[in-house]
Amino acid sequence: MFGFLLLLSLPFILYLVTPKIRKMLSSGVCTSNVQLPGKVAIVTGANTGIGKETAKDLAQRGARVYLACRDVDKGELAAREIQAVTGNSQVFVRKLDLADTKSIRAFAKDFLAEEKHLHLLINNAGVMMCPYSKTADGFEMHIGVNHLGHFLLTHLLLEKLKESAPSRIVNLSSLGHHLGRIHFHNLQGEKFYSAGLAYCHSKLANILFTKELAKRLKGSGVTTYSVHPGTVHSELTRYSSIMRWLWQLFFVFIKTPQEGAQTSLYCALTEGLESLSGSHFSDCQLAWVSYQGRNEIIARRLWDVSCDLLGLPVDW
């Protein structure tokens, strides 16, 4: 009888505790009052989710914001929504397919011809747990989009970021990087492939890239940070029915895209973070990085291998 009554009361208990759980899990809010008139920002994957909320906040602060999206139609819808909400007409959509180096190079070429400055590069876009597939250039999709695509984009825009200093680069990683390993003999999933692990490997690559990039940018006025946005309801789960089911089951513990954008915004806007360039953040504070994520030898080798795969000079 007691068990039956407890079961009946469970919805009421959840109703009472859910707000407290949500408040606890959404901790970490960007409280910066920095305004951005005259500043230029690029946010990849900004047509939806965390990227759209990040772009919206930057636009609210007066920045010229470029939504770099694979789906231009969805990007235009997002841009109109952001313009309507913020009153900022300087929100633009440009085609960027991170699974195609030709598209990345075309985006960068057009942007550099269009803009004199770039102050914020938010490498937000990504894929998660997709079936084994390859990019237009033959890279495994996770490492190709999440790491190599943003690696190339950053390379192509870096001189503009230096010219516009102080400027910042924010790379979205994940708590999942703790499960990641960089196996150079299986970087493309040639010998063994797991969609979940491939995602984790690529998120570890984001952290290693941030770490190595920060070393190379020391004294340039450009700083870089990696972030874990939290567990966020987004379109990243579109390839996994299991993940979509888990997201629905544990909805209480899932952040909204706006909440998920807070750490990206914190790293992009908070004054005084320059000395922490190369660091990893979660919930708007420094976060623990896995052992391999702190390995400078692996970071340097991944840099060299990435340059080789993309046909880039090693010293940039």
Curated annotation (Swiss-Prot):
Reactions catalysed according to its record: all-trans-retinol + NADP(+) = all-trans-retinal + NADPH + H(+); 11-cis-retinol + NADP(+) = 11-cis-retinal + NADPH + H(+); 9-cis-retinol + NADP(+) = 9-cis-retinal + NADPH + H(+); 13-cis-retinol + NADP(+) = 13-cis-retinal + NADPH + H(+)
pH dependence: Optimum pH is between 6.5 and 7.5 for nonanal as substrate.
Subcellular location: Endoplasmic reticulum membrane
Segments on the Cytoplasmic side according to the record's topology features: 22-316
Gene Ontology, cellular component aspect: endoplasmic reticulum membrane; photoreceptor inner segment
Sorted UniProt keywords: Acetylation, Endoplasmic reticulum, Lipid metabolism, Membrane, NADP, Oxidoreductase, Signal-anchor, Transmembrane, Transmembrane helix
Recorded topology in the membrane: Single-pass type II membrane protein
Residues reported in the UniProt entry to bind substrate: 174
One of the protein's GO biological processes: retinol metabolic process
Tissue spec. comment: Expressed at high level in liver and testis. Expressed at lower levels in smooth muscle, thymus, submaxillary gland and epididymis. In testis, expression is restricted to pachytene spermatocytes. Also expressed in four layers of the retina, including the outer segment of rods and cones.
N6-acetyllysine carried by residues: 109
Task of the protein: Retinol dehydrogenase with a clear preference for NADP. Displays high activity towards 9-cis, 11-cis and all-trans-retinol, and to a lesser extent on 13-cis-retinol. Also exhibits reductive activity towards toxic lipid peroxidation products such as medium-chain aldehydes trans-2-nonenal, nonanal, and cis-6-nonenal. Has no dehydrogenase activity towards steroid. Seems to be required for homeostasis of retinol in liver and testis.
Miscellaneous comment: Shows clear specificity for the pro-S hydrogen on C4 of NADPH and the pro-R hydrogen on C15 of retinols.
Protein name, per record: Retinol dehydrogenase 11
Organism: Mus musculus
Gene designation: Rdh11
